[in-house]
Amino acid sequence: MIFTKTPLEGAFLIDLEPIGDERGFFARSFCRREFEAHGLNPDLAQCNISLNLRRGTLRGMHWQVAPHQEAKLVRCTRGAIHDVIIDLRQDSSTFTAHFSVDLTAAHRRMLYVPEGFAHGFLTLEDDTEVFYQMSEFFAPDAARGVRYDDPAFGIRWPREVLVVSDRDQSYPDWEPVAERGR
């Protein structure tokens, strides 16, 4: 695996190194030792799959607060997404900055999202599937979110948002979230 730092402290793009032959290829997509060598959280508590039927579907921006903060490893296994993370760690040099990248099934690139980051994505194709590996179990009482179009972050989505859940649409602006600790 090839680990590439993003502009956000602690977040990485991870590319596979396929070994191919006449059968196809073999590639490692997770290795505890390699994650530890790069200072990444190697714990695996839960894996999730998100199927998104329509292009323009938005999910996010989600995170969990302590003591249930989670790191995520995100990969698009069918279709394509525009993936976005926001650094919400107050002691970070990249606090409130965001990073985005297109992830597709074709290139198999993954995004490592550290604890304390909000995460979300917009589907770029119909029938898009996303696979997540999480370092922590889902804890409803620790779940938080900010709106995908919150002006505090200035995220530019590459296409119109056509489908978004009521929950994701109703998240408050960042300032009220920060003041409430939510």
Q: Where do the protein language model's features map onto the residues?
A:
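Non-catalytic, conserved peripheral segments adjacent to functional cores
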Residues: 1-107, 125-127, 134-182
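Conserved SET/PR-domain catalytic core that frames the SAM/AdoMet-binding pocket
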Residues: 104-121
